[in-house]
Amino acid sequence: MNKSKVTSKKVVAETKVVNNKKSEPIAVSEPKKSVSKPTTTATTTVSKSPVSTITTQILGKRTKTPVVRDEENEDEKLDFGNIDLNNYNSEDDEDYESEEDDEGDDEEDVESQNGSIVYSESEEEEEGGINKALLEAEESLVEYQSEDDSGSISSKSSSSTTTTTTTTKKTNNDEEEVAPNKQWTNDPNQFYDSDDSSEDESLVNRIGNIPLEWYDDYDHIGYDVDGNKIMKTESMKDSIDKYLDQQDPNFWRTVYDKVNDKKVVLSDDDMALLKSIQNKHFIPGYDPYADWYDSGNNHPDSIHPMHNAPVPKRSFFPNGTDEEREIRRLTKAIRMGWIKLNKKGKKGEKDKKDGNFDLWADEGEEKEKTKGIRRIAAPKQKLPGNVESFNPPEEYLLNENELKAWHLMDPRERPHNFIPQKYQSLRQLPIYNKLIKERFERCLDLYLCPRTTRVKQFTKDPTKFLPTLPKPQDLRPFPSHEEIQFLGHKARVRSISISPNGQWLASGSDDCTIKIWEVSSTRCLYSLEVESEVQTVAWNPNPIYNILAVGYSNKIIIITPPLFGTQTEHSPETEKILTKPPTDSSTEQQQNKSVNWYQVTGADKAKLLEKGVRIEIHHPFTVKNLTWHYKGDYFSTTSPEEGTRSVKIHHLSKRATQSPFRKSKTPNQVTRFHPNKPIFFVADQNIIRVYDLMKQELIKKLITGCRYISSIDIHPQGDNVIMGGYDKKVCWFDLDLSVRPYKVLNYHKMAVRKVIYHPTLPLFASCSDDLSIHVFHGMVYDDLLQNALIVPLKILKTHESINDLGVLDIVFHPKQPWIFSSGADSTIRLYTN
């Protein structure tokens, strides 16, 4: 079926001669001058059928059959004048067929004539009549459909018609032009011209909005619009084919269409659009600042936005706000004369408005005149609470233990300066004896203490004040959980110590026993019962000596535990240091007559010899602390009850004792030796003194700010000191930095019992009566310009509280990231990583 397209043009066509094979002009009769209606322009070929039949076919098909246009066939345009059927014969038909053959060869020549109509020389005379009829036509658009190559048309002229044939080609410029009076038919496909585009044209796969994974196991990806399978092409390529595709010069602009399983090459416009989006620019051709003018013609109901403005927000609020009511009140008061305004103004106000000032006045004089004294109200006294009542609740009254703790507490740290008491009636209440003193202190505060106002600063992000610390997970290994419990003691375990090789653990308890445990198996291999509670135990830090020192009551005993068999199996160094007779010690003994050395011998000491007890050292007072020198030949003891001579240094190989300090304001509590230098640390209740043993002089004093020191320890490198106190403080000192603490850590809720450094790893820990063991990462750098790094790692809390006592002692394993702890619950616990 031939599909044709009818257009209307009001342009006068140019006439040109078409050469055919016979080189004969086409015979065309002169058209009649009287034309009742304009002729139509259509693309068709006139057949030999009668005119009446042609008219019937045209009218019937125009009203019933919809026109289907073929986008692939080019449209033709024919101009019809008055057709003369008398001059039409069979010879002309043969000539016409020969001309059709020539038209195929000359098609390119016809199209290159800018869409103009080609006529022969004999048609020049009728050109004027035809063009005139075309210009007068108002409805020149006729769309029809013919079933064969020859179409039939009937003109609506009352006069006789004349037959003529004219073959034309419509160019691209003519296709773009659309008649203003074009009439559309009921054909649903009439709008889909070759120039139209839609989003569905590129969509070949018509499976709909379903997951494409459903087609992974098939050889096709879906179906087209006709229901045919779309076989996989691009997705079936292997790596070699994909590599060869990179040779394509347009590979960099080729994208893969997953739905249609094909590759799409992006055009220059697409690349420009993507580049604009990437650079956050507007798309090409878009003007964001184009001028806008609305004439009002676009609104069919003649409603202009100026007359149909949106409702303002103020209409949703109640009539009259507080500010409006206040303004109305003041306005009425001024109008009625109730409020009188000072129209004259203050003196100097005019100069201020003009910007003038006294050039020769003293500097600051103007400010003093205008600056007033800002009065700050006196702070109000705190209102009395339930604890100050004459009949307070039972929970506010102190029991015996709380009363003792209240008396031992510093007055500045007490929650209140009186002891709550309970009376049955108000008449039994005595006179408050501190009333005059409190009133006097109140008066002193009012006229002597400066007053200030605190401005609360709002901080959006309080975390910015915190230091940037590494994550604990990046600082492993460190002890993180409880692994083993050593059970055997019946009372609180006051002290524990680990051997230099990390194989044996010694412990001393209030049940008057000394036990040695094997760390790997938790078996108790040695047990010794003494006369009183064990205060301290300490292994010799030198691994060549198998010596354990134990302090209980006023005695120090030196033990060589029979862990390796009989005494003869001990190392010769151990036997040598214990059996060497004292030499040149007469002067030292004269200086320390209060300290006596005894060799354990005889039948009465047979049980002690079997247990490995070799030497006994008797002191005048109870020994609380014992520490070894790193070489293992010296150790020091501390007896706080002795006063000025509380610190003593013992020489094991010479069996000698000396008191280096003769005067002391406060009793000494703890002593420590430097790990690799002849430096001695002595701590009293609130100050740590550092002495040089070679020069016998004081090097420096460390100001702790602590009220009662309980424990100190020295870093393995010797340049840092850590201290713990009964006032819940832990202080880190950098000896190269200052005599004051580098860091003060207040994280324990009760008294700190022990602080220690790890011998080999950058770890330190502290234990307290609050049942917690805090493990920290403490890195000390060789660079003196870089401060130590302190990072909290883990809080271990597994002990139980007995009589308000918690963890009493802790010690690190010499090689592993393990920590041992002993508590008032008579248990020893091992924490591992």
From Swiss-Prot:
One GO CC term, this protein: nucleolus
Lineage of origin: Eukaryota, Amoebozoa, Evosea, Eumycetozoa, Dictyostelia
WD repeat windows: 331-370, 488-527, 529-569, 618-660, 663-701, 704-743, 747-786, 802-833
HAMAP family, A to Z: BOP1 (MF_03027)
Region of interest (Disordered), ranges: 20-202, 568-592
Keywords: Nucleus, Repeat, Ribosome biogenesis, rRNA processing, WD repeat
InterPro entries hit by this protein: BOP1/Erb1, BOP1_N_dom, WD40/YVTN_repeat-like_dom_sf, WD40_repeat_CS, WD40_repeat_dom_sf, WD40_rpt
Main localization of the protein described in the UniProt heading: nucleus
Compartment annotation: Nucleus, Nucleolus; Nucleus, Nucleoplasm
Keyword Repeat appears in the UniProt entry: yes
Keyword Ligase attached: no
Residue ranges with Acidic residues bias: 90-111, 136-150, 193-202
Family under the similarity heading: Belongs to the WD repeat BOP1/ERB1 family.
Annotated Low complexity bias: 36-56, 154-170
Biased composition, class Polar residues, residue ranges: 182-192, 582-592
Single GO biological process annotation from the record: maturation of 5.8S rRNA from tricistronic rRNA transcript (SSU-rRNA, 5.8S rRNA, LSU-rRNA)
Task of the protein: Required for maturation of ribosomal RNAs and formation of the large ribosomal subunit.
Name of the protein: Ribosome biogenesis protein BOP1 homolog
Alphabetized GO MF terms: ribonucleoprotein complex binding
